[in-house]
């Protein structure tokens, strides 16, 4: 049946159809090759926006640095990073005046966090620049490597396990004359394979000691590694994002904790809340502006866009903000918080992998690493790349570019939101002292501005004043990309508002479908996504029912588990037909075993195993959920798991789904090819780390898991815990005397071994 698409929209208000124009179906674009070019663009643009600043040289690293703070006031509409310190401080003061005690209280909350946070907070997060190996690693490995190197260089404060003590080590490491690190390297040898008698290349991984002098160490500690941002929809060009090393991360975490605490208390802040809570917060601001504008005033809203938010922000400005916010706090606290912006003022951007050259005639490929860009002959490059390299050369040191101004993407989202809100806060009548006034919403670089005034001239004047005020603190509202509308219709962080938020359903499209984890998780995630969209995104019952049928169809094709009585032939049909025929209660078979689908929109919240349990044959139940069955994964016994789903904008979200361990919740094995590469040592470290953590969690179930205070090690904690538990179990008669004696003996042996080591 052919459908004329326009018919679909006859009954749909225009604003609800907006979601159909979004580039959210199909695969998002990914980048290939190196991000070196994008990173050079970022560095060059950032310097261009601040070009009228003052140049200085960092005495420790020799890096040239540009400081645009308190630079010339802009005379045109070009984006610029010349923030004025006194203006920023005044904006902070007014923000505090409108919210008495806000900074004081947030500082107290943060101080508590600083004293309690454990160093394992830094293991969260994905790829992290590992300064010991000079490339990216999983966060946990990068942290373990850093601590290992610190300890071998005599820095041991981190052994307490508190993040603040680890940061003391970081500070001390920067004063040392040098650091000795262990790097991994590969040896290749040609050997004859005993089985096939062919020559094969054998790789072995060696570790070697290397000494970094103070300058080289500082450069690495201040380095942000760069990559290309993947899967960005609706953009023609890719852009670079940064990942900082372990020295910077802890300090950034505390600054963001403080800023988050402030944002939570600001009604104009779109962070740190999300989803429905965010919509409610925004709706309140709009309601306030609309009720106040009744009949006498006009009210207009700007859907705002800022030009290159990060590249015009400045760490020195953040330092000024922190200095003001913490002005009555103890010295140690002020110092800890001021380090992150200071490090960012001296940051270095690593240019990534470099360029790949191909010679068509000779079929040769060669890579020019970033380190060589400083002195390679430019005749090999095309025009645009040549310009980039020429511009960046004065800034290069060891394959990294000095980048003092600007804040790479996503580093201080909360703190920059505080800055944005402080300007929105100045829109109150008591500050504008005229007939117009404004309010709005800010979420990192995205904003919506609502201006009220008696007439159109007043609205224009209000917008102009807002625009100029922003310029004074390094925020550049884009006149080309922002648009103004009567209040009641605007967009903010991809939420569309029209007398209330309309569901932008297309954003959720990428998360529908089969995730590809395993049969059990995929079924559970699939129905949970549909359920969540019925709750949050206006997914109606008929559409949800259709989505469910499409999902089941997709699922059956993915896992080749068509119903046992179907005619479709796949490589699993023989086994599934056999199972179907010998099953008495066919309704009890899981869909992944060729059973019928019993889901409808009323029972999406029930895991499939539970839904069908009463209908299953007894022997089927026994095979499916028998803990002795070697295929039943008992890695997670918790009833809730987390899946990563990809909404269309923003980072991948974590979504909870019910997990029931059955023969279908298998975990695929790691690809073996990694075992022959230089990553192997790292993989083994990671598994070791994982095993220790899992073991530790077995001893401390989450209910009783109070993180050990003081400097007892993990092993000591586990031994003492084992002794306490054993005594309780023995006295209550749960274990026999012999078992109790054996446990005590094992504990003593472990302690003895530790003493010998």
Swiss-Prot record:
Region annotated Disordered, chain positions: 50-82
Region entry Promoter-binding site, spans: 249-256
GO annotation terms (biological process): DNA-templated transcription; symbiont-mediated suppression of host gene expression; symbiont-mediated suppression of host mRNA transcription via inhibition of RNA polymerase II activity; viral RNA genome replication; viral transcription
Modifications after synthesis and translation: Phosphorylated by host PRKCA.
Main location: host cell
Any one of the GO CC terms: host cell cytoplasm
Domain RdRp catalytic residue range list: 286-483
EC number: 2.7.7.48
Family matches, as Gene3D superfamilies: 6.10.140.720
Keyword Calcium annotated: no
Biased composition range(s): Polar residues: 55-64
Catalytic activity: RNA(n) + a ribonucleoside 5'-triphosphate = RNA(n+1) + diphosphate
Keyword Phosphoprotein (UniProt): yes
Keywords: Eukaryotic host gene expression shutoff by virus, Eukaryotic host transcription shutoff by virus, Host cytoplasm, Host gene expression shutoff by virus, Host nucleus, Host-virus interaction, Inhibition of host RNA polymerase II by virus, Nucleotide-binding, Nucleotidyltransferase, Phosphoprotein, RNA-directed RNA polymerase, Transferase, Viral RNA replication, Viral transcription
Group of enzyme by EC: transferase
GO MF annotation terms: nucleotide binding; RNA binding; RNA-directed RNA polymerase activity
Record note on quaternary structure: Influenza RNA polymerase is composed of three subunits: PB1, PB2 and PA. Interacts (via N-terminus) with PA (via C-terminus). Interacts (via C-terminus) with PB2 (via N-terminus); this interaction is essential for transcription initiation.
Annotated family: Belongs to the influenza viruses polymerase PB1 family.
Function: RNA-dependent RNA polymerase which is responsible for replication and transcription of virus RNA segments. The transcription of viral mRNAs occurs by a unique mechanism called cap-snatching. 5' methylated caps of cellular mRNAs are cleaved after 10-13 nucleotides by PA. In turn, these short capped RNAs are used as primers by PB1 for transcription of viral mRNAs. During virus replication, PB1 initiates RNA synthesis and copy vRNA into complementary RNA (cRNA) which in turn serves as a template for the production of more vRNAs.
UniProt-recorded name of the protein: RNA-directed RNA polymerase catalytic subunit
